[in-house]
């Protein structure tokens, strides 16, 4: 946090006093203060940014008899450094020069032009294409949590409430906001120590009355009941703090944020943070994107489709009607998915573009991209209708053509306009008569100078006479020194060089003024016409959002169609019956990494047989099998086809995993403690409709303790909860539980033994195996032979 010291008795320069007065309003953000062609940072800001971004730290003047630390960057490099700051969760305030307010001191007026924070940026260059950029806010009171998220790039505003810290954390990790507002006295503050983008807010910022008022004012309504918001006071407090923060950073107008929605946990399959991590749905164990379910399923044609697929995978929906509708759409798309994919690639990131248009911050490039995208709409509608599918015709009805916008953008915009409207050269020729007139004056300077040069040579008989211009002198006449005696009296000498002399004339000065005025006029008219584009398109924003959301969903489903066809997936049967039946199922990720065919396996979980105790050798396929069952359930519940010969999947409300573990030393938790915490959560929260995967419970303690705990946990899951459970173990004694519980079945992964060597078959069979083949695996890992011989000897001693 920056320290701001204002001392009325010090001798700070007017510029430093101005800097400090601005900094007082944004003590926890970097202030980029424009000085000529540089942005400068002073005091603690300079020290911190020099360390963070490797910027040279210098000094400038004194304050309170101490040298002032300073760090600066060229104004042309601003966005590059802002991007780096945003990635590490920091925020910045940009202060621009406006005009001189005191000629005596040279003090220039400066104003805050924008505030840039990780959760509120909408500029394309600062955003990830594949991930929604969320601003989050959480309020904790009376052991409950209110949570709000807003995506300024789409206008999606959600609130939710949670009874436990675990359920809130699950949602926080699912949404993963770039910036999170929390109260100063938040009880679980230590959890956020390593999280980027945390902003501490005063408790009063979450005041419920103020929050209600802000929300009603924003949505222009007398109450929030029309949005389905009733007694959600904690979530409303969080949402109110979020809106207050946006006003603080000068985001007072949010025309594209039209509604607020309550998100209910019961609508989606619950997965806690351990499940998301262990199943490697979005990120792998290392936090990267490779070899994840998303990496296999994502061949989307648009960035917005990619983000929607990610959202679906993070929160699989439980509504069977919606799931079956998606399956039917995929079936209908099989004949046209290739042609649709080509058209969808021309859409780009239209979701974010229309949000920037709504906020009047769209660039010329955005309008050009919109023009290209709208050209595809009619073609997409045609392809959908050509299938004669009623399901696809209903989709096409939600996509409008927007011919009036398309005609305007084709007429008004150049094919390749400048990057910003400030540079000009954005509006097409023949679009506006006044603009064309002033452009002709501004752009015909070279013709005039050529004409003036020819006429002056002829009039004065000076063959060395040339007319030219540069930034310093403007327009000038140049005559070689041998001819300067022929220069007329109305030529005013402005520069003498080694071989020539340069002059100005009243006629050239007048023409130069006319050209400069014309250039200013061109920029003024272009800016006016550019703003007219916003005025024309903004009334269509609500309709455009519906079309864009429809195209995003179409992109995801078209992508899943392509995946189903290319990867040989089948349509699962989703019903409200109990159980999971898969025939010849495959792991969707692993099968794509193997050079040899994947070994298929089946499963049948039913009310009479809902727990499998799985034994088998290390590396035999137990963990892969368990994960593939869970991943197939997730795929089915987002509406995807699945890797199997046949699939029937019943109700599933939650998925839990206890697979692998690691010390959490930062919180003083050992491997075994982590195991027990995760297991406790599973036993407290799972139901008979939950899918539970437990891999080798009890490894982190003694064999006797581990076996006893594993036995007791299985009894609780099988006898009391009746959850659909896959329990892998090397405790062979656990297979005896089948004799006490009729719903338990023993399964094992087979191996072939030959001459003291084994071959993994990766085939699951009924029954159990009482060998783990640990020494064989150790040999495969190339442990020294002396170690292996000693281990074999000890094994015979321990278990003769």
Curated annotation (Swiss-Prot):
Keywords of the record: ATP-binding, DNA damage, DNA repair, DNA-binding, Nucleotide-binding
Ligase keyword on record: no
MF terms (GO), sorted A to Z: ATP binding; ATP-dependent DNA damage sensor activity; damaged DNA binding; mismatched DNA binding
Cleavable signal peptide: none
Residue ranges of the TM segments: none
UniProt-listed SUPFAM superfamilies: DNA repair protein MutS, domain I, DNA repair protein MutS, domain II, DNA repair protein MutS, domain III, P-loop containing nucleoside triphosphate hydrolases
A GO BP annotation: mismatch repair
Pfam families linked: MutS_I, MutS_II, MutS_III, MutS_IV, MutS_V
A GO CC term assigned to this protein in UniProt: cytosol
Residues where ATP binds: 616-623
Family per record: Belongs to the DNA mismatch repair MutS family.
PANTHER family in alphabetical order: DNA MISMATCH REPAIR PROTEIN MSH1, MITOCHONDRIAL, DNA MISMATCH REPAIR PROTEIN MUTS FAMILY MEMBER
Functional note: This protein is involved in the repair of mismatches in DNA. It is possible that it carries out the mismatch recognition step. This protein has a weak ATPase activity.
UniProt cross-references to HAMAP family, sorted A to Z: MutS
Name recorded for this polypeptide: DNA mismatch repair protein MutS
Source organism: Buchnera aphidicola subsp. Baizongia pistaciae (strain Bp)
Gene name, Swiss-Prot/TrEMBL: mutS
């Amino acid at each position: 946090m920056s320290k701001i010291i204002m001392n009325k008795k010090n001798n700070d320069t007017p510029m430093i006093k101005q800097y400090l007065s601005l900094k007082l309003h944004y003590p926890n953000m970097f202030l980029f203060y424009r000085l000529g062609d540089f942005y400068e940072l002073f005091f603690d800001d300079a020290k911190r940014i020099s360390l963070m971004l490797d910027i040279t730290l210098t000094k400038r003047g004194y304050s309170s008899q101490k040298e002032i630390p300073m760090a600066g960057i060229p104004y042309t490099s601003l966005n590059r450094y802002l991007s780096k700051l945003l990635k590490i969760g920091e925020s910045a305030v940009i202060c621009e020069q406006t005009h001189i307010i005191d000629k005596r001191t040279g003090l220039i007026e400066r104003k805050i032009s924008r505030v840039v924070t990780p959760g509120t940026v909408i500029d394309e260059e600062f955003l990830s294409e594949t991930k929604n950029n969320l601003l989050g806010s959480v309020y904790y009171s009376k052991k409950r949590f209110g949570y709000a998220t807003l995506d300024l790039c789409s206008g999606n505003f959600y609130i939710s409430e949670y009874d436990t810290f675990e359920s809130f954390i699950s949602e926080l990790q699912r949404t993963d906001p770039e910036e999170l507002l929390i109260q100063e006295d938040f009880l679980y503050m230590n959890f956020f120590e390593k999280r980027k983008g945390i902003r501490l807010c005063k408790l009063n910022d979450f005041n419920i009355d103020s929050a209600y008022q802000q929300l009603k004012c924003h949505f222009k309504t007398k109450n929030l009941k029309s949005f389905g918001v009733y007694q959600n006071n904690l979530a409303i407090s969080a949402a109110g703090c979020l809106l207050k923060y946006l006003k603080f950073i000068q985001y007072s107008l949010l025309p594209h944020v039209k509604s607020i929605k309550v998100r209910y946990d019961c609508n989606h399959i619950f997965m806690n943070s351990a499940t998301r991590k262990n199943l490697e749905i979005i990120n792998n164990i290392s936090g990267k994107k490779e070899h994840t379910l998303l990496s296999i399923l994502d061949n989307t044609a648009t960035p917005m489709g990619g983000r929607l697929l990610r959202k679906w995978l993070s929160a699989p929906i439980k509504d069977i009607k919606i799931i079956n509708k998606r399956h039917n759409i995929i079936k209908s798309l099989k004949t046209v998915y290739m042609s649709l994919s080509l058209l969808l690639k021309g859409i780009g990131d239209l979701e974010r573009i229309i949000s920037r248009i709504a906020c009047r911050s769209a660039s010329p490039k955005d309008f050009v991209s919109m023009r290209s995208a709208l050209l595809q709409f009619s073609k997409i509608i045609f392809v959908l209708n050509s299938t004669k599918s009623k399901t696809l015709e209903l989709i096409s009805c939600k996509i409008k053509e927007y011919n009036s916008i398309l005609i305007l953008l084709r007429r008004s915009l150049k094919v390749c306009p400048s990057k910003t409207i400030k540079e000009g050269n954005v509006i097409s020729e023949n679009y506006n008569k006044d603009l064309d007139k002033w452009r002709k004056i501004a752009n015909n300077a070279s013709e005039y100078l050529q004409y003036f040069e020819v006429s002056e040579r002829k009039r004065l008989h000076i063959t060395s006479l040339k007319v030219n211009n540069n930034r310093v002198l403007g327009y000038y006449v140049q005559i070689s020194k041998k001819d300067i005696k022929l220069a007329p009296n109305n030529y005013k000498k402005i520069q003498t060089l080694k071989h020539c002399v340069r002059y100005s004339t009243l006629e050239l000065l007048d023409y130069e003024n006319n050209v400069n005025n014309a250039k200013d006029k061109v920029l003024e008219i272009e800016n006016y016409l550019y703003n007219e584009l916003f005025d024309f398109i903004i009334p269509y924003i609500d309709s455009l959002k519906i079309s864009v959301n429809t195209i995003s969903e179409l992109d995801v489903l078209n992508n899943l169609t392509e995946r189903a066809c290319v990867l040989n997936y089948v349509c699962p049967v989703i019903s409200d019956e109990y159980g999971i039946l898969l025939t010849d199922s495959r792991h969707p990720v692993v099968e794509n990494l193997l050079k040899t065919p994947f070994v298929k396996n089946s499963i049948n979980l039913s009310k009479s047989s809902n727990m499998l105790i799985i034994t088998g050798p290390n590396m035999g396929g137990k963990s892969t099998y368990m994960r593939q069952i869970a991943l197939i359930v997730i795929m089915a519940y987002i509406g995807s086809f699945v890797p199997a010969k046949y699939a029937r999947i019943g109700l599933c409300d939650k998925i839990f995993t206890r697979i692998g573990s690691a010390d959490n030393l930062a919180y003083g938790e050992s491997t075994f403690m982590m195991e027990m915490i995760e297991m406790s959560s599973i036993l407290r929260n799972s139901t008979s409709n939950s899918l539970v995967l437990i891999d080798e419970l009890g490894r982190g303690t003694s064999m006797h303790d581990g076996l006893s705990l594993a036995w007791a946990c299985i009894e609780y899951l099988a006898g009391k909860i009746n959850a659909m459970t896959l329990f892998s173990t090397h405790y062979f004694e656990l297979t005896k539980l089948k004799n006490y519980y009729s719903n338990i079945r023993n399964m094992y992964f087979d191996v072939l033994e030959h001459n003291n060597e084994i071959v993994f078959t990766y085939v699951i069979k009924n029954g159990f195996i009482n060998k783990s083949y640990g020494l064989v695996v150790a040999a495969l890992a190339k442990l020294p032979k002396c170690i292996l011989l000693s281990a074999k000897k000890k094994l015979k001693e321990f278990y003769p």
